[in-house]
Amino acid sequence: MKKTILITGVSRGLGRALTKEFIRLGHVVLGCGRSAKEIAALQKQFPAPNDFSIVDVAEDAQVAAWAKKVLATHAAPDLLLNNAALINRNAPLWKVPAQEFSNVIDVNLKGVANVIRHFVPAMIARGRGVIVNFSSGWGRSTDAEVAPYCATKWAIEGLTQALAQELSPGLAAVPLNPGIINTAMLQSCFAGGASNYPTAEEWAKTAVPFLLKLDASNNGEQLTV
C-alpha cells in the first residue's frame, strides 16, 4: 500500500538516501531541507505527487507555513521522520562557542518539536501514523568532544518517550538509533575510519523496510536499525 512519508533534512545524507529508496518503492515523499539547490534538484528528479520545500526546521514560522502548504494538498503523513540534525565541530564543551551550541539545540531538539507541533495534530485527527525521531548511539551513550550533540540526542530520547504517552490510540512515537553510517557527519568525527561503515544508500536498503513495518504497537519503543 502506498504511504505518505514526511522527511526532514532531505538535502543530503540519510534524508536524501531515504527519500530515494521510499520513492523507488512507490511511496510519496514530502521532504524539506535548507539547501535551495538540492531541494530544486530533488523536485526535478522526483516530481509530483512528491513535494520538496526549502525549510529551516529551527524556524517555527517556516515549519508552520510548510505544514499549511503540504496539508492543503496531501493527507497527514503515515510516517513522519524527524531526521534533520547538526553536529558540533569536535571540541571540548568549554571550547564550543555559544552560538554553535545554540545552533545544534535549535535544529536537533527545537526543530523536532516544531515539526511535531505543526504536523502531529493532523495525524491525530486522522487516527493513525508513526512519528520517528532520529536519535543516535550518542543518545544512549556519550563520547568526548560531541557533548552538544549528545545532549540533544539524549533529549530526543526523553522527548519521544513522553510524546508516546500523550498520543491517542492508533499512533506511535519512537526514538530511532539509525546505527553508524558513513555520512559527512560521521566523517567529521571518525575521519578515514568512516569508510568502514555502510554508506547512506546501503543503509537505506535496510532502513526503509524496517521503517515501513512500524505501527501503533511500537509506541514508545527504543529502536535501532
Describe the role of every protein-language-model region:
Residues 136:
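Residue(s) in the substrate-gating loop at a strand-loop-helix junction
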Residues 116, 152:
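Active-site helix of classical SDR
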Residues 54-65, 98:
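The beta1-alpha1 cofactor-binding region of Rossmann-like NAD(H)/NADP(H)-dependent oxidoreductases
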Residues 11-12:
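Conserved glycine-rich cofactor-binding loop
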Residues 25-41:
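Conserved glycine-rich Rossmann-like NAD(P)H-binding loop of the short-chain dehydrogenase/reductase
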Residues 91-93, 100-102:
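Substrate-binding pocket helix/loop in short-chain dehydrogenase/reductase
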Residues 169-171, 175-176, 183, 192-225:
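C-terminal helical subdomain
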